[in-house]
UniProtKB/Swiss-Prot annotation:
Organism of this sequence: Desulfatibacillum aliphaticivorans
GO biological process, one term: SOS response
EC annotation from Swiss-Prot or TrEMBL: 2.7.7.7
Binding residue positions for Mg(2+): 10, 104
Family: Belongs to the DNA polymerase type-Y family.
Bound cofactor: record note: Binds 2 magnesium ions per subunit.
Localisation per UniProt entry: Cytoplasm
Site entry (Substrate discrimination), positions: 15
Protein name in the entry: DNA polymerase IV
One example GO MF annotation: damaged DNA binding
One GO CC annotation: cytosol
Length: 396
C-alpha cells in the first residue's frame, strides 16, 4: 500500500515579496505591507522587518515603533491575486489535488504523481525552482505523510527551504517540538497544557485520551491524534464534494478481526452503492474505528485512480483495518468513507496501469446489482459472507 505523500507549499513573505519584485530598489530594506497610515494591521513584512520584531496582524502603529525607517506600503490585492494564480498554475502541473489555504499557501497530494515526476522531494524542489525562476519570488515546502506534519515542516524550514519528514521518522521529528506547533493548540490550550506539566509534543503523548478529552472536549481527541503524527484529513480541492460514508455502532462489541472484516465488507458495499447513486467516484478510502473504551482512530489511503467499486473499497479498507488494534481490542463502531470525490463534470486522467476492460466489467456488474436492489429492495443480493449477519441484525 502506497504511503500518502503530501506537500505543503508556503510563499515566503508573499505580499512583501511581490512588492520587492515590483520595486527592486527596496531590496534590503524593511518593507511592511498594510497601509501608510497608523490605522490597520500588518499584512506582510519582509524578513528585514521581521528581524526587528514586526509580525503579521500587528498594529501598524506598533510596527512603526519597532521599525521607524521601514517602508510602509498599501495592500494591492489584485496584484497579489495575479501572482497567486501563476503560482497555482505551477502546482497544477504536478497534481489536480491542490487545496488552497490562502493566496500564498496550499496543500498538494502527490501520492500518484511520483511515477511521472519523481520523488516528493524532487517534485517540491522543481515547484520551488519554477516559482523562483518564472516569478522571481521564493517558497518553502514541507513533505510528509500527512497535512499536519507537512505544514509543520514547511514552517520550520522558512524562508526559502525544503524539509522532508520520512514517514517512519514522523514521531522522532515531532517529539521535541513545543506544543504550540500542533494545530488546535492556541494560547488558551497551550496555557492549560503547561499547567498539566506539558511543554513538548513528547509530553502530550504521556497524557491519556480520556485526560485530554476531559480538559479540552472534542479537541482533546484531535490533540491526542496529532501528537502521535496521525492526521487522515485528505487534500480537498475547492468545490469538491467532501465525502460519502457510512458507519455502524454495534449492539454488542466486535472482538475478532474476521468479524470486523465482514462489517467492513458490508459498509464498503453500502458506500459504493451510494457513490454510484451520486454518480461519483472517490480517491481516498478512510476507515474509522471506535474501541469499547471510546478511543477513536482513523486510517486512510489515496488510490491511483478514483473508484466506486465495492471490492476495491473493501480491499483497501481491510488493509487499513490491519493497521489498527482491531482483533486485540473490543470494537463498538466501524466506519468507511470515500473522499476526494470525482464527479462526471470533472476530468480525470486514468492511471498508466489501469485496465479499461476490467473496469468496464466491474461497472456492468455493479449496474446489474443496483438494478436488483432498486427493484427488489436493498440487501436483496449480498456477498455470501454477509448473508447471515445482515439478516441477524436486520441491516439493509
Amino acid at each position: 500500500m502506497t504511503e500518502n505523500l503530501i506537500i505543503h507549499v508556503d510563499m515566503d513573505a508573499f505580499y512583501a515579496s511581490v512588492e520587492l519584485l515590483d520595486n527592486p530598489e527596496l531590496r534590503g530594506q524593511c518593507v511592511i505591507v498594510g497601509g501608510a497610515s497608523n490605522r490597520g494591521v500588518v499584512c506582510s513584512a519582509s524578513y528585514e522587518a521581521r528581524a526587528l520584531g514586526v509580525r503579521s496582524a500587528m498594529p501598524i502603529v506598533t510596527a512603526r515603533k519597532l521599525c521607524p525607517r521601514g517602508v510602509f506600503l498599501p495592500v494591492r490585492r489584485a496584484r497579489y491575486q495575479e501572482i497567486s494564480r501563476k503560482v497555482f498554475e505551477i502546482f497544477h502541473q504536478y497534481t489536480p489535488l491542490v487545496e488552497p489555504i490562502s493566496l500564498d499557501e496550499a496543500f498538494m497530494d502527490v501520492t500518484s504523481s511520483t511515477r511521472l515526476f519523481g520523488s516528493g522531494e524532487e517534485i517540491a524542489a522543481n515547484i520551488r525552482r519554477q516559482i523562483e525562476s518564472s516569478l522571481g519570488i521564493t517558497a518553502s515546502a514541507g513533505i510528509a505523510k500527512n497535512k499536519l506534519v507537512a505544514k509543520i515542516a514547511s514552517d520550520l524550514c522558512k524562508p526559502n527551504g525544503l524539509l522532508v519528514v520520512p514517514a517512519d521518522q514522523t514521531q522522532e521529528f515531532l517529539d521535541p517540538l513545543p506544543i504550540s506547533r500542533l494545530w488546535g493548540v492556541g494560547p488558551a490550550s497551550r496555557n492549560k497544557l503547561i499547567s498539566l506539566g506539558v511543554k513538548t509534543i513528547r509530553d502530550v503523548r504521556k497524557l491519556t485520551q480520556e485526560m485530554l478529552s476531559a480538559n479540552f472536549g472534542r479537541n482533546g481527541e484531535v490533540i491526542y491524534a496529532f501528537a502521535r503524527g496521525m492526521d487522515d484529513r485528505p487534500v480537498e480541492p475547492p468545490g469538491a464534494a467532501k465525502s460519502i460514508g457510512r458507519e455502524i455502532t454495534f449492539d454488542r462489541n466486535v472482538y475478532t478481526l474476521e468479524e470486523a472484516y465482514k462489517w467492513m465488507l458490508f459498509l464498503s458495499e453500502r458506500v459504493a452503492r451510494r457513490m454510484r447513486k451520486e454518480e461519483a467516484t472517490g480517491r481516498t478510502v478512510n476507515i474509522k474505528v471506535k474501541y469499547a473504551d471510546f478511543i477513536q482512530v482513523t486510517r486512510s489511503v489515496t488510490l491511483e485512480s478514483p473508484t466506486d467499486d465495492p471490492g476495491e473499497i473493501y480491499t483497501h479498507a481491510k488493509k487499513l483495518l490491519q493497521k489498527t488494534l482491531v482483533g486485540s481490542k473490543a470494537v463498538r463502531l466501524l466506519g468507511v468513507t470515500l473522499s476526494q470525490l470525482v464527479t462526471p463534470g470533472q476530468a480525470w486522467q486514468p492511471g498508466l496501469f489501469d485496465d479499461p476492460t476490467a473496469s468496464e466489467r466491474k461497472r456492468k456488474l455493479n449496474q446489474a446489482l443496483d438494478g436488483i436492489w432498486d427493484r427488489f429492495g436493498s440487501g436483496t443480493v449480498e456477498p455470501a459472507a454477509l448473508v447471515t449477519d445482515v439478516a441477524k441484525h436486520n441491516l439493509r
